[in-house]
């Protein structure tokens, strides 16, 4: 997925744009869909479910569940199960799933390319609370279908509406997915390398205003890891 979306975003999208051009509608829907995906991860997957930082109405939780599937970062249950050990064992190479001390590329994307075993891949014992959430479990059960419908269906629908299916698939589909993925991944990698540490130096997390802007506040990572 990462390779395919990267090729389409970095090669196919610019080439298509050079020959056929893009309009205001491509830019508008890119911003809307990118924001929807990243907010669903930040406010939904991360703060609401993984950290239980606040409570939300079922309608908002449903919207976040759809947006999270659109972001293509696995289900709420799986994402939260990976993330909770990161905070509990931050920078521990043996227990932190994406420990920054194992290097930039590992914490950015390499940790997702590791060998998986069936028993550990589906072990959600650290998220028993989330298994009581009907929306979380509904999304987990239907994640693949939801991911396919949102990632292909939304771009196709917009393409039909505006008369440019290929252009919308490249911008709202591939480019949006590529940038949404890597802006999130940069929090696991770059936000543990580049930035300031005004709140704690006990771990590698850093505050980075530039990353915070593109990730709806996630770049204030030093603050997040201490509070």
Model-derived segments and spans:
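Non-catalytic, topology-defining segments of multipass membrane proteins
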Residues: 1-185, 190
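Residues that scaffold the ATP/ADP-binding catalytic core of kinase and kinase-like folds
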Residues: 48, 223-224
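Active-site-proximal inter-transmembrane loops
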Residues: 127-135, 194-220, 226-227
